[in-house]
């Protein structure tokens, strides 16, 4: 966008033209007015709605989520959350949480946000209860399937019939 200094309209148009190349976990789609949650398409079939429901629940409870983060993580929360993200990329669910009960608190707030909507969508985040309790998710299950029998076992276990 360097070539567009001083021309905010041209810079905005260039951004809109190229923004679909940016790979984020979640991003606004300006042209169509939606929020795209990319990890949703990478889940086993029975969990396909879980990331979207979790994201929606957190958005619906945004004020409570913000207060929870500030209250539990404290000052410098952005830096602490970025460090947590880095650790979670490497260690997954086993990464030390930035505060005791952090994930439990976020899941409870997401559930509350979905419940307030009144559509019964909170059922879509139920599988995350097991992830929190057993500290293991679908990626670990897929890894075990692959270790047992390679690609054939993995496809056999996760193929949509």
PLM regions and their residue ranges:
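C-terminal accessory/tail domains of diverse enzymes
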Residues: 1-161
């Amino acid at each position: 966008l360097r070539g567009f200094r001083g021309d905010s309209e041209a810079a905005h148009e260039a951004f809109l033209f190229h923004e679909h190349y940016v790979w984020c976990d979640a991003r606004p789609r300006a042209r169509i007015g939606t929020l795209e949650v990319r990890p949703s398409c990478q889940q086993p079939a029975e969990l396909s709605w879980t990331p979207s429901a979790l994201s929606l629940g957190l958005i619906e409870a945004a004020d409570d989520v913000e207060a929870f983060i500030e209250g539990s993580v404290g000052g410098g929360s952005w830096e602490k959350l970025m460090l947590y993200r880095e650790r979670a990329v490497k260690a997954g669910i086993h990464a030390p949480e930035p505060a005791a009960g952090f994930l439990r608190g976020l899941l409870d707030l997401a559930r509350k946000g979905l419940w307030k909507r009144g559509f019964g969508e909170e059922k879509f985040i139920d599988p995350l209860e097991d992830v929190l309790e057993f500290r293991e998710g679908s990626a670990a299950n897929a890894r075990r399937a692959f270790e047992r029998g390679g690609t054939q076992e993995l496809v056999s276990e996760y193929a949509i019939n």
